[in-house]
Amino acid sequence: MSLLCVGVKKAKFDGAQEKFNTYVTLKVQNVKSTTIAVRGSQPSWEQDFMFEINRLDLGLTVEVWNKGLIWDTMVGTVWIPLRTIRQSNEEGPGEWLTLDSQAIMADSEICGTKDPTFHRILLDAHFELPLDIPEEEARYWAKKLEQLNAMRDQDEYSFQDQQDKPLPVPSSQCCNWNYFGWGEQNDDPDSAVDDRDSDYRSETSNSIPPPYYTTSQPNASVHQYSVRPPPLGSRESYSDSMHSYEEFSEPRALSPTGSSRYASSGELSQGSSQLSEDFDPDEHSLQGSELDDERDRDSYHSCHSSVSYHKDSPRWDQDEEDLEDLEDLEDEELPEEEELEEEELEEEEELEEEELELEEEEEVPDDLASYTQQEDTTVAEPKEFKRISFPTAAPQKEDKVSAVPIEAPDVSKGIPKAATPEEKAAAECAQEAEPPKSEESFRSREAEEGQEGQDAMSRAKANWLRAFNKVRMQLQEARGEGEMSKSLWFKGGPGGGLIIIDSMPDIRKRKPIPLVSDLAMSLVQSRKAGITSALASSTLNNEELKNHVYKKTLQALIYPISCTTPHNFEVWTATTPTYCYECEGLLWGIARQGMRCTECGVKCHEKCQDLLNADCLQRAAEKSSKHGAEDRTQNIIMVLKDRMKIRERNKPEIFELIQEVFAVTKSAHTQQMKAVKQSVLDGTSKWSAKISITVVCAQGLQAKDKTGSSDPYVTVQVGKTKKRTKTIYGNLNPVWEENFHFECHNSSDRIKVRVLDEDDDIKSRVKQRFKRESDDFLGQTIIEVRTLSGEMDVWYNLDKRTDKSAVSGAIRLHISVEIKGEEKVAPYHVQYTCLHENLFHFVTDVQNNGVVKIPDAKGDDAWKVYYDETAQEIVDEFAMRYGVESIYQAMTHFACLSSKYMCPGVPAVMSTLLANINAYYAHTTASTNVSASDRFAASNFGKERFVKLLDQLHNSLRIDLSMYRNNFPASSPERLQDLKSTVDLLTSITFFRMKVQELQSPPRASQVVKDCVKACLNSTYEYIFNNCHELYGREYQTDPAKKGEVPPEEQGPSIKNLDFWSKLITLIVSIIEEDKNSYTPCLNQFPQELNVGKISAEVMWSLFAQDMKYAMEEHDKHRLCKSADYMNLHFKVKWLYNEYVAELPTFKDRVPEYPAWFEPFVIQWLDENEEVSRDFLHGALERDKKDGFQQTSEHALFSCSVVDVFSQLNQSFEIIKKLECPDPQIVGHYMRRFAKTISNVLLQYADIVSKDFASYCSKEKEKVPCILMNNTQQLRVQLEKMFEAMGGKELDAEASGTLKELQVKLNNVLDELSHVFATSFQPHIEECVRQMGDILSQVKGTGNVPASACSSVAQDADNVLQPIMDLLDSNLTLFAKICEKTVLKRVLKELWKLVMNTMERTIVLPPLTDQTMIGTLLRKHGKGLEKGRVKLPSHSDGTQMIFNAAKELGQLSKLKDHMVREEAKSLTPKQCAVVELALDTIKQYFHAGGVGLKKTFLEKSPDLQSLRYALSLYTQATDLLIKTFVQTQSAQVHGGKGTRFTLSEDVCPEMGSGVEDPVGEVSVHVELFTHPGTGEQKVTVKVVAANDLKWQTSGIFRPFIEVNIVGPQLSDKKRKFATKSKNNSWAPKYNESFQFSLSADAGPECYELQVCVKDYCFAREDRTVELAVLQLRELAQRGSAACWLPLGRRIHMDDTGLTVLRILSQRSNDEVAKEFVKLKSDTRSAEEGGAAPAP
């Protein structure tokens, strides 16, 4: 920085003398100075001005103005580049410059002028040379400094990648003070915005406009001119900023501050800088070394202005014993050269020794991890460092004492790389290395010189020492010594005082990635202690800070704000123009213009009196002291003393608590109380401070212009000093970044910051003449100076000045304060943190054994009460006195509580606290539209610190919730409430992230809790699985004998038994129930998203299912357990699923898997169950048999065996049913297998009953067979019920088919049993029917019965029915009682058939031979009569039986004899009428009025139909019967198949199909002829030949062919012809013709030819060989044809034919009938010499 001196001498104007009344303004950087106004065309001002210059790329603007009545006009201007201004310590004659009329602008800055005028001005401008150091001495020191630089360059440290450029010496400077570091003062463009907390850093803007630097000049009104940002990357920039390189990863804008290391009288320097974003942490290099070049161009300006006020510089040691008052250095003389050299050489030697020591120590010590992990652990108190006289090294002791780390500033930016070895070594050196000896020697020497009062040290030596110390500091830092050597009080950069309190330098860069064991250990520690102490208790070990806070606390409490004296205002009349002390507005009016305090004399508007809240007594004391009113002052002091005594007497507990909290001895406390009282009495008279204010930016301002915008600028006033910023045109969110410096000597002063809208119009010009402020008011904020300390970056809401003000928005200020005597103290916010944390530690850990004592407070502000009454008053008064916001108090208390968040009741308090913190930041007010994130970013607590605190708290809460069952046991209602509050706290953290941090999608609290619950359940399941037997034995085993220890190898599941799984299910249920009943009501904040009971069931089931599935697969391979055990386990699993899992949304619409696990075991059980059921069946039948098949009850008609069998089956089915298998496919498998079991069991029952049933029927016990039939029917009934129970129509198709098939089989069995039972009555019925026949034969009378004889017929019918009715009546009555209805009907049907068939074959159609043969015939024949037909269907068995009967009687001749011998049994018409009537009676009897068989069944019964048909045939003539036979019997030989027709007998056709047993064929030619006149029909038959005859005989075979015509009305015609016989020919040729005459009344369809091949035998009857039948209807269309007829062994006929044959067989007197019977009864004779013919 250089000092520019400008002398405005005189000017020459072109114009009249009276025209000019001119003054000159000088503008450079952002400072404007103005001369007085002088009249005339050749004015002479002769005024000198001085400016601090830190940028030589700008220019000096000189403007000459002519003063006017309303506004001023510019005469001309000239722009002088600063680079062209000479350097000299002497004034020159000046230079005449021509004024131009216009300025040339570039980027809103003047860069030249144009359009010359005729006016000229004489100016003398020069830069003052720094000191008066001789050239020779300057060269000497430059050489020495180069040697030191060379030493530094030889040391290979981590920033060697990009060395600083050589420092050129411009020719215009006699000495380049960049060598000494003074040219490098604006080395940190980031210092104003970048707090160590990163609280006030803008995270979104990387394009903040260039900064504006301001320096204070006497008599200068402050205007603004921008300067370009200072270059980056100097060595000093690094040396001042080693503490901040953990923030490199954050891109940030250049800082607005331009504070100099050595500021002018009105300026407070920022002192230290921070490494800019251009520093590359990976390459450890500084990018760009333009700073040196720039600094080369800056000249040193004034030793006075650069040294005397630079108390905030790190190169200014504040220890009084180390450094004299710097202002006195101006007058010190230069020491002797020899002394200087000697000292310098000593220093060099010590540096070299130190360098060697450091190189030896570069290896990383073993305990480096203890440092690198200090982010999470408290660092032990390091060794005391001796204070070094170097300004940069001096604060080392305080730093090490207070090196309790807080947090890396920005967790969200990611963890930086692990520290390099050089950094680790540097850190170790910073912790362990003893300070060099030279420090103590130099320090002691300097102290001695100060004590001896030697004033010989000159400015040169002082400056050289500073340069020397700076270089040495750089060397130390390069080796790592200076890394941690910054003091807590170090004022470098914004928030420099917070460097140790609120951040952890180098931690994020240096901390290596922890090992797994480290992580595990840290988790264990976090479980015990909560959040790490680095976040919660950063000041407990900082004794120096605690000592200071102790004093400040006493000061705040001995005379608290709440006890201050208010002003005594009264209405006051001003006699001269007076301005309001508060708003600086004129007190308008003629009289009674405002208010005046009678005590301290402050004047203000009536509306402003409430804004003046400073203590009146102290203001009065200050004022009277300054004005010499000592008596008045003494009175005030006495009042103050009394008040403090009263305070101490009334509230002794407060001061006792303070003493105990800070562990101060009683004597020291007493002394300190006296000192504090005296400081209060001294008041503000001895108080002074330096204030540096950076106006950063504003947001959301009011629009005052018609364009909808404003042109805002800011005025800052401290006391009577007022400065302003540059105007930002047309912007409601302006950015100024301008820095102002003030001196303040009154702690009751206020900083008044006003935002105004610049108006450049006539109205504004006029207003300017009458008002101090002609511009529109946009808002203001008033800041009490007493609330400032250290550095702070704060957003202030803009307030109204009057009720009419339209104000909105907020302004951001960076304020740095140095209070005399407290230069090294931390900001009040840090001091408050120290107080609060120590108080919390004392109250919680010391007094209450680590348990947080929660105050009992109620009301809306209860959350602001942190302690009991005494402790709360301490923190509140401290906060009130020193301007600590309540939100800062809340955040600090939240941080303290975070270390005890697991203590009872704490989560609820933390949740409430955070909710109110959220509300404070997220709920913006109407007066500002600043976003929540911006408001939070401006938090004095530290944005990154609080975010990291929440992040770490969030992680810890998640870990604790992941073990909620241990940390919050369900047995403790208090802990359950804490659990609920913990979730509320998580919700508040989520709200904070979403609303305050404005993160896009932070993890939802409900999801976080859900994940934690699942994690806990996973671990819980694993625990109970691994310790199942032990836990079960402890919790549920009541039998002491069973509580034996389970061997470790049997702790888990076994394939030998299933006990483990049953116990595990019990434990799982207990877990789910606990979650359902205890934790679900507790964690009810998210009813739609989180239900702990349901999640518990879901997780437990999922894990259990996985293990159970694998276990069952293993069991399936070995099958070592009983199937019943598997079934029992299946039921337990089913219950578990249905009770807790089935209704869960995840499983609701899914088919569960568990039935599939047990399917093999259920099938196994069903297999075994079938065997059991069969055994049970046999046992039941045996018991039933022994008991005689007794009815189970009076109303039950079946015996107990059926009940027993189905009871067992139903029990088995109930077990399957109770499985409630939800898988339809598996249910189908079960049903199929069980259906087979049912089928096998019931069929076996039916088989056993069927085998023995006949034996029961043979006995005279009708009851037992009936009960057995009832049992069979009951099987069918119960089967139907079981079918419905198993699903009915919904039953599996295969199972359903099995059961239906079983039902059919049982039905057939019942039919068979009924038939057997009815057949047992056959002998009795046949006997009764014979008796009926006998009675019937006695009925006399022939012909039709007249109507008059009906009564006699009825009587006869009754007589005939008597025998059978007696039998039926006696049995059917019994059957009706003991038979099931269905069984009864079946028995009745069988009896009905038996009665009908017996009557038919005994009465209507008596047998051809004995009764046995006829009975057999009819029985077999009866089977074909069930289809309900009027004409009986074809059935060949009857004919065959007649033939067989004939064969049994021997030859046909015997049959004829038999028939002749039989009495004529043909029924008369009357007898037929009697039989008809009897049939009706029997039918009515079997119907039994609806109780028995249905009438429709009886009417359509084929047996009745057959009987009636036979009766009807009795009345028909023989011809009609024969006609009926021919028309109905179309399949008498080979089923009517095999017959072929040709046109000529010469053509032999192929063999016919359908002939299964061919015995030959015969060829005949038949021709039909009808006489056209008479209608007489003739048939000519030509017997051609016989072929393939099959016949064996012992004698000569002499075959011949006999042809018979069969039909009606042939009694008078020839009916038979025969050919001649052929000897021994089996294919004889005959060629003989015969002619038959037929009746004209019947057509060919009524006739047939029967061809019979016979073997001629002499003296005996011819033997029949084969038979064939040709029905003439087949020739009706042909007329004539050659017929090939297959020969058969016999004639086949159906029932009709058989009936006709039997009726005709009884007509012994009718030749035609006898012939017909013989013809149709003929059959193949027995062969001789061979086997008998097949039947």
Curated annotation (Swiss-Prot):
- Low complexity bias locations: 264-276
Q: Which residues form the C2 domain?
A: 1-97, 672-796, 1558-1685
Keyword entries, A-Z: Calcium, Cell membrane, Cell projection, Coiled coil, Cytoplasm, Differentiation, Exocytosis, Membrane, Metal-binding, Phosphoprotein, Repeat, Synapse, Zinc, Zinc-finger
- Which residues are recorded as modified (Phosphoserine)? 239, 241, 244, 255
Sites binding Zn(2+) 2 sit at 597, 600, 616
Amino acid composition bias (Acidic residues), ranges on this chain: 318-366
Detail which positions bind Ca(2+) 1. 705, 711, 757, 759
- Zinc finger regions, Phorbol-ester/DAG-type: 566-616
Binding, Ca(2+) 2? 705, 757, 759, 776
Q: Where is the composition biased (Polar residues)?
A: 203-224
Cite the binding residues for Zn(2+) 1: 580, 583, 608
Q: Provide ranges: composition bias, Basic and acidic residues.
A: 193-202, 434-448
Q: Where found?
A: Cytoplasm; Cell membrane; Presynaptic cell membrane; Presynaptic active zone
Taking every annotated instance into account, which residue ranges of this chain make up the domain MHD1?
Answer: 1106-1249
Q: Does the keyword Transferase apply?
A: no
Give the function comment from the record.
Plays a role in vesicle maturation during exocytosis as a target of the diacylglycerol second messenger pathway. Involved in neurotransmitter release by acting in synaptic vesicle priming prior to vesicle fusion and participates in the activity-dependent refilling of readily releasable vesicle pool (RRP). Essential for synaptic vesicle maturation in most excitatory/glutamatergic but not inhibitory/GABA-mediated synapses. Facilitates neuronal dense core vesicles fusion as well as controls the location and efficiency of their synaptic release.
Q: What is this protein called?
A: Protein unc-13 homolog A
Gene behind the chain: Unc13a
